[in-house]
UniProtKB/Swiss-Prot annotation:
Example GO biological process: mitochondrial electron transport, ubiquinol to cytochrome c
Binding-site positions, a ubiquinone: 61
Keyword Electron transport set for record: yes
Cofactor(s) recorded in Swiss-Prot or TrEMBL: heme b
Keyword Transport: yes
Cofactor binding note of this UniProt entry: Binds 2 heme b groups non-covalently.
Gene designation: cob
Organism, scientific name: Aspergillus flavus
Membrane topology: Multi-pass membrane protein
Protein name: Cytochrome b
GO CC, alphabetical: mitochondrial inner membrane
Transmembrane portions of the chain: 38-58, 85-105
Ligand binding (heme b b566): 56
Binding site for heme b b562: 42
Length: 145
């Protein structure tokens, strides 16, 4: 459903819609390769968002600083970022990555779903992502464009 909706939505853009669809999916049809690309895209998006958040933090703290949002030149308006908080945050991140590594390396399927091993089938919507009945008219309108 998601790949079909995105495909139809992108193809509705005048002049460049077909090119966008072919760029995203490699073609207009929704088949096994398309669904695998869709799943891979959804795997990568959280990392892209994390990178954008990190870039935002770096840019925010680089010149003006979070304690000086107006850009006032005097240092008396800035609040120093205490080294204690940096150390505390680093310890927390370190512990988080240790726990995450235990799950990833020793129990990789503990937090997974058995449906992850089912081959993608474009003709059958998995029960977990069947759209709600009240969204079906909007999908029908979108498909008719």
């Amino acid at each position: 459903w998601g790949a079909t909706v995105i495909t139809n939505l992108m193809s509705a853009i005048p002049w460049i819609g077909q090119d966008i669809v072919e760029f995203i999916w490699g073609g207009f049809s929704v088949n096994n390769a398309t669904l695998n690309r869709f799943f891979a895209l959804h795997f990568l998006l959280p990392f892209v968002l994390a990178a954008l958040a990190l870039m935002h933090l770096i840019a925010m703290h680089d010149t003006v600083g979070s304690g000086n949002p107006l850009g006032i030149s005097g240092n008396y308006d800035r609040l120093p970022f205490a080294p204690y908080f940096i150390f505390k945050d680093l310890v927390t991140i370190f512990i988080f990555f240790i726990v995450l590594s235990i799950f990833v390396f020793f129990m990789p399927n503990a937090l997974g779903d058995s449906e992850n091993y089912v081959m993608a089938n474009p003709m059958q919507t998995p029960p977990a992502i069947v759209p709600e009945w009240y969204l079906l008219p909007f999908y029908a309108i979108l498909r008719s464009i």
